[in-house]
A protein has these predicted regions:
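Glycine-rich phosphate-binding loop signature in dinucleotide/nucleotide-binding domains
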Residues: 79-81, 182-185
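Active-site-proximal alpha-helix that buttresses catalytic centers in soluble enzyme cores
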Residues: 36, 40-109
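Domain-level recognition of soluble alpha/beta enzyme cores
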Residues: 205-231
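Short, Lys/Arg-enriched N-terminal segments with co-localized hydrophobic residues
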Residues: 21-34
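Generic beta-sheet signal
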Residues: 37, 83, 186-194
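Conserved histidine-centered catalytic loops in small-molecule metabolism enzymes
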Residues: 80-113, 140-151, 224-234
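Phosphate-handling substructures
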Residues: 47, 56-61, 104-171
């Protein structure tokens, strides 16, 4: 079951400290009033089958059950050609996105800003092998229908957002939302991870969430993001 949460982005990077206000005014006048973000957790991965030892396996793929779960998303949230599909740079998320979009020729992009994220954040935590990011060369070879977002922080293509500080993560969220707006699509569909999706929800909704709020495999969470109140803030 999906959830819809309406938010108004008045805290976007650069606005609150006076940078980029002119850009946003022009941006707002040229673009639509908002967009819908549809977060989907990937299907069941091999790393969950024999935990904790299976968490040490790098780049785990979907299980057969995970593939079947991904097929069901085609019915639960049918994609349209005008949608933009964004996937975390892991095998299981890219496989989920590939299956979901098998019947639709929509634009598909890989982006490290929705890669695995530890939740709740723990200072000093380390990234497990199952959450390592797939390198760009392998993505191009295995998932050639996906384009790679190249304008992002190069360090995040190797280390990801898994253990970055909360302040750094919040800046990532703000940058990601502006980037999504620049795409010009009404619906942005994002295949990501339980911790990442919950971290995005917590920051955008300004509420305290726990691991009990994690989506189930191929669970869906929708947000309608509006720019309406932004003009009054700048």
């Amino acid at each position: 079951m999906s959830n819809v949460f309406y938010i108004s982005i008045f805290h976007i990077a650069g606005i609150k400290d006076g940078i980029g206000k002119k850009y946003v005014r022009g941006f707002y006048s040229e673009r639509r009033m908002g967009m819908k973000l549809i977060f989907v957790r990937h299907g069941e991965g091999e790393h969950t089958k024999d935990s904790p030892s299976s968490l040490q396996v790098p780049h785990p793929p979907l299980t057969d059950e995970g593939r079947n779960q991904a097929k069901l998303i085609q019915c639960n949230v049918p994609l349209q050609e005008k949608d933009i599909l964004i996937a975390s740079p892991t095998i299981r998320t890219l496989q989920t996105a590939t299956i979901w979009s098998a019947k639709v020729a929509c634009q598909k992009i890989v982006h490290p800003y929705v890669s695995p994220r530890i939740f709740p954040y723990r200072e000093g935590a380390t990234t497990l092998p199952c959450d390592h990011i797939v390198d760009q060369g392998r993505i191009k070879k295995l998932f050639s229908n996906f384009s790679i977002e190249k304008s992002t922080n190069k360090q995040l293509w190797t280390e990801g957002i898994n253990t970055i500080s909360e302040n750094s993560f919040q800046r990532i969220v703000e940058e990601f939302l502006l980037w999504c707006y620049e795409l010009g699509a009404e619906r942005i569909c994002i295949v990501s991870h339980d911790g990442t999706i919950t971290a995005y929800r917590q920051y955008l909704q300004k509420v305290v969430l726990t691991r009990a709020d994690f989506l189930q495999e191929t669970g869906i969470y929708e947000m309608d993001v509006s720019f309406k109140s932004l003009i009054g803030e700048i």
